[in-house]
Regions:
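Short linear motifs embedded in intrinsically disordered, charge-biased segments
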Residues: 1-209
Length: 209
């Protein structure tokens, strides 16, 4: 029997949102899920008997685990990066027990909590690790085919959408290497891990946010 497939603008597959707007819907959904989880753990954030270290560990394990799920596939716009950074600072200020009215700079919040990498650096590292994983796959694997494939036909008018590989190239530039060096380095898992460690991301947040 024939089965008619329903057309939709977005659907959830393996926990990630696949949509026409790229990463936008998935980012919004993840922000909503993470915010709800963070609020449900309020008793932990306000607990006087728990150390900063313990609270940060809970935050990184639970909240970031939800927020950053599937983030290695995201192609983020500047607006989305800013939204994620503001959300992160809202969370961290709550953990530290301060608000924006206290006029404490972001870098000082990071220092107090011994928190070394901002959320966009974490996403960048996850994306590069996933890029390395794809590079080590065989050419016949679907992720490799999609990464290296080209879509034939006319492009729509206007500025073309940024591809995932374009973002990876920008990530590599942040590390001070080019995409060709990254591709060669990624073929060796241990070497790629070392490269990511030796070329740390720019982890300082803007003190104005």
């Amino acid at each position: 029997d024939s089965y008619q497939l329903k057309q939709t603008d977005a659907f959830v597959y393996l926990g990630g949102t696949i949509s026409r707007d790229g990463s936008e819907s998935d980012v919004k959904r993840r922000i909503g899920l993470a915010r709800g989880l963070f609020q449900s753990l309020n008793n932990i954030w306000i607990a006087k008997e728990l150390s900063r270290e313990t609270k940060v560990q809970v935050y990184e394990t639970l909240v970031l685990g939800v927020l950053l799920y599937n983030s290695e596939t995201w192609t983020l716009k500047v607006e989305q990066k800013n939204r994620l950074r503001v959300l992160e600072m809202t969370f961290l200020r709550k953990i530290e027990g301060v608000t924006r009215r206290d006029r404490i700079r972001n870098v000082d919040i990071y220092a107090r909590l011994n928190y070394h990498r901002n959320i966009n650096d974490r996403i960048r590292e996850r994306r590069l690790r996933y890029f390395g994983h794809i590079c080590r796959m065989g050419r016949e694997r679907y992720p490799t085919i999609v990464l290296n494939g080209h879509v034939h036909g006319r492009r729509n008018r206007g500025r073309p959408k940024k591809r995932w590989l374009d973002v990876v190239k920008e990530d590599c530039e942040e590390m001070g290497i080019n995409i060709h060096e990254a591709t060669r380095g990624a073929m060796d898992r241990e070497r790629w891990t070392t490269m990511l460690t030796e070329h740390p991301m720019r982890a300082q947040a803007s003190p104005r946010l």
